[in-house]
């Protein structure tokens, strides 16, 4: 299942990224510079030429939206940025937040890691990037799309969201934000000494900054759409249900990530805080002492602790998340904003198993070890061990073919982690505001020779299509069919940002998700279908909980005897 990038594609990718990092798209001259005023000072951006177009884009990079979260502000809510005098340079990519970029090795992106190693890393990382069409000015009132990057809440940076082409082609403003990651972003003691969710609070601060300042860049603060993939989608979904984010945005796009993703939300902070306390060597008997000890650690020491976490959950902190996301959704305690919610066909194909360290388990799966693997899997899902048999019956059937078992296991994990949570959130939200649901089905041509033939769309495969062939600031080569798919997807996303509805003349019609359960299959030939994974949804939301209830009842009766 390990994914190796084809050399020709990788070379093009790395060369493209290198060009961006040394920033040579446009000539830095007085004529191409641009100055905008924010509430804390002036910033000079740059007019760049967007490749493959005749258009220009103004880029403003590394604008601070909060104070550096260091010293006493480590494990504390973000504070407003300090004003500056003179004109701040906004032509260099900001330092990324502290993170373990060695994770890129684990997903087969070693060469990319080498390039990214040249980008500075710092705790002082609460910055955002802005991309605007060259003609945009105060009063343009263009729709705004705020990109929240993914990366399991432990890795990523604003520069992953290269909004150049999207801004120019669709005449809107794109903002890409950074937020604290890993332990620095989500450590919690579960009490007033460190409530947690610092990364989410950073995102709220960035959205407030957008409300205050985006008009100076040609954006409309009353037409803000937040969007993201994976943990970015989870972030977007969490803002929909958080009282702290109310009024800061008007539309939400969640790509393969919602607030119910099991690995990114936890009722309790205990597991993470115990691990952090143990690894840090802070022999603290209480929360206050532990937080004081952790604040005294160097960035390098924090990075060592971070390496243990392949992902890190947000917590129910009583403030950003007053209750568990499922409770907030079920009690209709959320902002009724229009949403696009979607998943990919093969969410657990390639990238996620490598991150989670399960690729080898899948590769070695056979009828002989299936029962043991499913028992372990059930335990990881926090299900009773007896549920392993139910999972086998639902997904594996009676087949002995190892390849079929591996495919079915991957489908099961993709459903549990991504598809079922997305459908649940869509069903909760649709009675209060329009929800447009999609399944991205296209197998990217540039992975044709490196993935199994049955695989269509892996986790995050849609991202380059949304940004017009750009991903992580790199350019991928599309076929003509893929260029059309990308243009359509950019148009759907931009229409939604403009009007809260993705449809317009010349696009295949995308129906709203109502009781007909219609959704759009996003491929080179888009099509409308009904009731995505209806049987699997029934299994996870009705059959399995009922069985668990029966098991608990039987155990209770047995205990009473």
UniProtKB/Swiss-Prot annotation:
Substrates-to-products reaction catalysed: all-trans-retinyl hexadecanoate + H2O = all-trans-retinol + hexadecanoate + H(+); an O-acyl-(R)-carnitine + H2O = (R)-carnitine + a fatty acid + H(+)
One Gene Ontology term, aspect cellular component: intracellular membrane-bounded organelle
Tissue: Expressed in liver, stomach and kidney.
Keywords noted in UniProt: Disulfide bond, Endoplasmic reticulum, Hydrolase, Lipid metabolism, Microsome, Signal
Bridged cysteine pairs (disulfide): 97-125, 282-293
Predominant cellular place of this UniProt entry's protein: other
PANTHER family: CARBOXYLESTERASE
Name this protein carries in UniProt: Acylcarnitine hydrolase
Organism from which the protein derives: Rattus norvegicus (Rat)
Encoding gene per record: Ces2c
